[in-house]
Amino acid sequence: TPYVRLVNDEKSSGKEVLLTWYYGIGYEYYSIDSTGYYNAENAYDKYDKAAASKWGCSVLLKNTATGFSADGITFEASFNRYITDEEIEDGVSPTDTKLPERNYSTDVTSKAATERATAMAIEADKVEFTDCAFLGSQDTLYTGNSATNMYFKNCRIEGNTDYIFGDGNAVFDGCELRFFGYSTGSVGGYITA
């Protein structure tokens, strides 16, 4: 749907509007169907598991979302930040034996546990974000392909590895790029890919 606008109408009082999700690449969940996206029936049935598409993105702006804008919204990929009850209940399990199991005692902010998980994946053109935050670790913000154009004003983008990636045409005006870091010490990372 084109020209949708999300606005935090209480941002002046310090209230946060948070859109978050817990999917990460390399893991399967009951709530994902064969398309790689959330399915309410699968979440209820808890019968088969599948892996996420599009880096397990919390929010996906499809190419039909032309002119989307957001003001004062926080978009978060919680996968490399903390474990949620919902993630555990969704039967999270690694697709490869080299990946760590995820449970309440897993240090998900360690370098070894870091995996791709996107807070915002943009495939739409002419999108705009003002006073928004994008929180993640690896691959926080996907800017789409060379046909997408976007504008970020006074936004904060956090991550530690390629946390801004894609071929999209993006302008960052007065934005803060913040290195999220790892719990396991000073390990460097790359801002863009």
Where are these regions (language model features)?
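Sequence-level preference for short, compositionally simple segments enriched
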Residues: 1-193
